[in-house]
Regions:
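Low-complexity, intrinsically disordered or signal/transmembrane-proximal segments
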Residues: 11, 16, 21-24, 57
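His/Asp/Glu-rich metal-coordinating catalytic cores
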Residues: 64-134, 139-350, 369-382, 401-405
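C-terminal tails and terminal domains of large nucleic-acid-associated
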Residues: 585-620
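Hard-cation-handling environments
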Residues: 264-392, 396-398, 402-421, 425, ...
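Polybasic, lysine-rich low-complexity intrinsically disordered segments
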Residues: 33, 61-62
């Protein structure tokens, strides 16, 4: 295969020296593990390719483009005006790269939905120009949709080793094969088509987070990813301020910056600050200690592990994602776990309660998480009197009720619960206003696009940009699907592309729409009321009293009188309607009238409006 690649490179016009350079690069050695076409595509993408290399294939297109003054397009497909679903397109001529590919979690208006991913139809329409996915870090709101994307697009994915390890696990779970994951480190520079991308180390609540400095034909674009400025991080690798300053000196055309904490003044505390709280709780606790945290925050987990070891406690990991991610983090060297301190759940009985520390999922009150099941006595480890539970996270918007219920249940079981309103058990991974100001000062961007947040977050970040001296006409409050066109000396919003939400329900992708969600909401509110009407097939004559089936409306055994009245009303109504039925084979009008009549009856009797489902059963007798 290697020989074949060299031949193809020669035919495309590469010099012997250029081809030989690939022979001696680590990238080439890694790429040969991919399929031939994939390898060729990636190698071409990472090479600075002059127009002459493709003169044979693109001559007419290149001649046409020279007179059109090409613009760089920035197109967010998700992540604006919402939490999650982060995805941003950078497009110039024949090259498209996509930054992040995340999911959002369903809200209370989406019953039965597992997750929400961005609408990728624009990428499908332009698949031949898509070169790569560039991932800033491994949180679900940045990688959660990648398996669905790679089922459609056979392009490389670039990310740090921890990010790619999480993606690889996700792809394995979804049985997505024949992919090409390209590992990079902070400080690396790669070239994909016309884009030159440098990965810059940032601090965040997950290992391996990077910002992106993208050099394009019209100027430098900086995308911060999720970040905060932490000078004392757990891994002793602080944010690379020097690289941001270096790009500020070069001149930044546009900045896309994290808006999550743009409402909050001051600076986000260092992750290391939590060590003081953990030390205090571990010193005072007399029984077992259970810590619930995000599994992906290996820095938080490392602090808990270190504190437990100092206090002579063994450590047990519970919850599927906690077990999986800690194993990955340990294997990659991000997490130090003393072998003799980690035990399985079954062996905890061999230790006194004051020697036990359990790290579990469930900081958001998720119904299938370890902490939730422990609080509901649906787990081998049942929390009780004398236990101390630390919920080391703040509730994500929309999860407040779930978290509150778990806290209440833990108190009812006699546990001592330590959470964010009582102690400093959580710090954010996102920059506050003073850190955002620092980034404005360092980068001095000509144009600014606030990203990653609800509308209120974006608005406050845009306000801050104006305070920092950026021309208000150079600040773009965009919506998902907007197209921002950037030239070397110009910027304007110009149209939209398809965008929105694709709902995932089990194995179904995008087959749930607004009508289905509306019916599900109605079902969840007042239930289902079904009337089964038997009729003679040839004559349309009513053959008996309709049968009634309800779900989530009333408990039939306690509602005999209502059901009897409903059957009588349904029989009278069906009899009248059957007499008027002109076409015995078409019961559409009959069912619509039954539905309307039963709705009025039930509303008058119960003040409820269940989903009413008339069913006509034709009997040939």
């Amino acid at each position: 295969m290697t020989r074949t690649i060299f031949i193809v490179f020669a035919q495309l016009g590469f010099s012997h020296n250029t081809t030989e350079q690939f022979r001696h690069t680590a990238f080439f050695a890694a790429a040969t593990k991919c399929s031939f076409l994939r390898t060729l595509r990636v190698m071409l993408a990472r090479t600075v390719i002059s127009a002459s290399c493709f003169a044979v294939h693109r001559k007419e297109k290149n001649l046409a483009r020279k007179s059109t003054a090409p613009q760089l397009k920035i197109i967010p497909l998700g992540g604006l005006g919402e939490i999650g679903k982060n995805m941003t397109v950078l497009e110039y001529n024949e090259d498209i790269i996509v930054i992040d590919c995340g999911l959002a979690f369903p809200d209370e208006e989406m019953p039965g939905i597992d997750m929400v991913i961005p609408d990728m139809s624009y990428l499908e329409q332009n698949a031949e120009r898509l070169r790569a996915f560039i991932i800033t870090h491994g949180h679900e709101d940045h990688i959660g949709a990648i398996s669905y994307a790679l089922e459609k697009f056979k392009v490389p994915v670039f990310g740090t080793k921890f990010t790619l390890a999480l993606i690889e696990h996700k792809l394995h779970e979804h049985h997505v094969e024949d992919t090409c994951l390209e590992c990079i480190n902070a400080g690396d520079v790669i070239e994909i088509g016309c884009f030159k991308i440098e990965f810059i180390k940032v601090s965040h609540s997950i290992a391996g987070a990077v910002a992106l400095a993208v050099t394009t034909p019209v100027g430098i674009i900086v995308h911060t990813g999720d970040f905060k400025v932490d000078y004392t991080p757990i891994d002793n690798e602080p944010i690379d301020i020097n690289s941001f300053a270096r790009y500020g000196t070069k001149g930044v055309l546009a900045l896309l910056m994290d808006s999550t904490n743009a409402e909050l003044s001051g600076v986000t505390p260092s992750e290391k600050e939590l060590g003081k709280t953990f030390e205090k709780v571990f010193t005072e606790a007399q029984g077992r200690i259970i810590v619930a945290s995000f599994a992906s925050n290996v820095y938080r987990i490392q602090q808990v592990v270190d504190t437990a070891v100092r206090h002579n406690r063994v450590i047990c990991f519970q919850g599927r994602s906690m077990v999986m991610i800690t194993k990955i983090a340990k294997d990659l060297g991000y997490l130090e776990l003393p072998e003799d301190s980690v035990v399985e759940l079954e062996k905890l009985k061999n230790y006194e309660n004051n020697r036990v520390c359990v790290l579990t999922t469930g900081s958001q009150g998720e119904s299938m998480s370890g902490l939730f099941r422990m609080a509901n006595a649906n787990h081998k480890l049942i929390i009780g009197k004398g236990d101390t539970v630390i919920i080391s996270a703040s509730a994500i918007p929309g999860n407040e009720k779930s978290v509150g219920r778990v806290i209440n249940q833990l108190f009812q079981r006699g546990a001592n619960v330590v959470y964010d309103r009582l102690a400093d058990v959580h710090v954010s991974g996102h920059a506050r206003r003073e850190e955002l100001k620092l980034m404005f000062r360092l980068l001095k961007p000509k144009y600014f696009i606030p990203v990653h947040g609800e509308t209120r977050h974006l608005y406050r970040n845009a306000q801050l940009a104006e305070e920092m001296g950026i021309d208000p006409s150079h600040i773009f409050m965009m919506d998902n699907g907007n197209v921002l066109e950037l030239g070397k000396r110009s910027a304007k919003l110009n149209g939209t592309v398809p965008s929105g939400a694709i709902l995932i329900d089990g194995l179904g992708v995008g087959d749930i729409g607004a009508a289905v969600l509306r019916e599900r909401r109605l079902l969840s509110q007042d239930g289902l009321f079904s009337i089964i009407v038997p009729v003679q097939k040839s004559t349309g004559e009513l053959l008996g009293i309709p049968e009634i089936i309800t779900r989530g409306f009333v408990y039939i055994k306690d509602s005999d009188e209502l059901i009897a009245e409903a059957k009588e009303f349904a029989f009278d109504l069906a009899s009248k309607l059957a007499e008027k039925q002109s076409r015995k084979s078409d019961w559409t009008g009959f069912k619509a009238s039954m539905k309307s009549g039963m709705k009025s009856f039930l509303l008058s009797k119960t003040k409820r409006t269940p989903i009413i489902l008339p069913i006509v059963v034709e009997i040939d007798c």
